[in-house]
């Protein structure tokens, strides 16, 4: 299956679930307060379990070198993303925290996993886990403090000891020591972790119900953030890592992951911190639509280099 078809399929699936969430909100089935409670379930239970369960897989020493390269390249990419977002998005802007967060963090799981699997198979997915691991560490430290607009030590400790960050390190220990959960417990936790994508889409759809679509489309910063997230960042990052002696597949996996649309985590953080979840939903929705054009283009450019 071609990259374009895989991307289009994932976007359609995502928007169908999002529309269900929007309908539930319009009909009063999900209230504003209810959506806040759902976001807590997603952030503090479902997402950590998804991270932990991703490490319940077979260890392969043959692929360890590629995985280490993926960690390094992913770290460079995130470093570039954070630096550029800080430089290009002024702190004087009233919603700079939402814009910076949306510019850095991508939907690398739901879009990235099926896309990478369709192009590079299971080996590509293994390399993607490095990017997703760093995503979860950074989104719960840098991302958390960016959205909360707090840099104090107490906030850092709270972010660094969040369930998702703990899940990363516990999952890595289980993976390296090849500790497997009993079948019944594994199946039970897998069912809960599988809720991550539909639950996140329902939350985003419910938040989108509060959005003035016509007003949103007139916001030039929405397009600027999307252009940065979908095209500028991945190209700049790829140019920086292009000459490193890493396997080409690893470079492409990191490129595609960084070029995925805006993460839904921003909407859930915005709900928790009483920011503007509607604006985050706008970033998510528009970037997801535009990624149907930009992702194939970025992928082709990467393959040509």
Question: Where are these predicted regions, by residue range?
Answer:
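Alpha-helical transmembrane segments of multi-pass small-molecule/ion transporters
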Residues: 1-305
